């Protein structure tokens, strides 16, 4: 009898344990469900990936015909993109901007069909419902979308840029305050001059020579690091390109001599 009771208690304990585990599993599942929006929000905030895109001859679409659209079109044309402009009204400024370029002007209401084959699209209309529809269509077609001034409807943000030759510095605020990015750009424009772009062009030439002639990877890294530093730039600005090249050649020779 005692054995039977003990067995009964063990069975009951096992059932209770199973029930506890079951409830715990349900709690964990519920907890994950509650946290999912938080995780999605966290990823949306933290997972921005800065990138410079090669847009040469790639189809891009700008929807809208106002001043903002004009600025976006100009930037895309400067990057070599093949721009398709869709707007119900196309003014003389837009026509003049696109004249002599590969841009295609389509005077029409927006249609999802215009997005076909595009790498990215920019919605620059003053119609919020239309902008939302453009974003939705882009998601379905896997086209990167930027709805101007609506961060939550953006797959990417267009940064403020300081450009000196091929030196480009992009400043972004993830759509939180583009005006602050513009303010920061002005400060950087005062620091980085056209000479920085010229210096970069000389570095590019020399880098090719170093890759061909300096066989040791560690030596290449050392030389390029020294030639790209502030002291080297100051020498370049004070003495000019020809003397800087002599300075660079001596630095390479000294390093290689030290290795022998």
Regions found by a protein language model. Name each.
Residues 175-260:
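An accessory alpha-helical subdomain
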Residues 120-124, 131-157:
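ADP-ribose/adenylate-binding Rossmann-like module
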Residues 11-22:
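Positively charged N-terminal leader segments that act as targeting/secretion signals
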Residues 99-116:
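Glycine-rich, highly charged phosphate/nucleotide-binding loops
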Residues 42-89, 94-97:
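Hydrophobic, well-ordered beta-alpha structural blocks that scaffold small-molecule cofactor pockets
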Residues 67-68, 129, 175:
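Residue-level detector of alpha-helix initiation sites
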């Amino acid at each position: 009898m005692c054995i039977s009771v003990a067995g009964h208690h063990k069975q009951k304990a096992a059932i209770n344990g199973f029930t506890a585990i079951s409830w715990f599993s349900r709690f964990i599942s519920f907890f994950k469900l509650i946290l999912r929006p938080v995780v999605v929000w966290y990823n949306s905030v933290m997972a921005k990936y800065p990138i410079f895109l090669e847009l040469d001859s790639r189809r891009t679409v700008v929807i809208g015909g106002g001043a903002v659209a004009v600025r976006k079109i100009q930037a895309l044309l400067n990057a070599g993109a093949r721009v398709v402009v869709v707007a119900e009204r196309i003014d003389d400024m837009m026509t003049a901007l696109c004249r002599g370029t590969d841009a295609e002007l389509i005077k029409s209401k927006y249609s999802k069909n215009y997005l076909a084959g595009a790498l990215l699209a920019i919605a620059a209309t003053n119609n919020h419902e239309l902008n939302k529809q453009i974003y939705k269509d882009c998601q379905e077609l896997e086209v990167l979308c930027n709805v101007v001034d609506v961060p939550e409807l953006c797959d990417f943000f267009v940064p403020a840029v300081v450009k000196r030759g091929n030196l480009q510095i992009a400043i972004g605020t993830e759509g939180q305050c583009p005006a602050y990015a513009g303010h920061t750009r002005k400060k950087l424009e005062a620091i980085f001059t056209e000479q920085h772009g010229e210096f970069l062009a000389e570095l590019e030439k020399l880098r090719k020579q170093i890759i061909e002639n300096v066989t040791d990877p560690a030596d290449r890294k050392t030389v390029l690091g020294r030639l790209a530093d502030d002291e080297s730039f100051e020498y370049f600005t004070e003495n000019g390109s020809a003397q800087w090249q002599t300075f660079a050649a001596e630095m390479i020779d000294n390093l290689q001599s030290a290795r022998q």
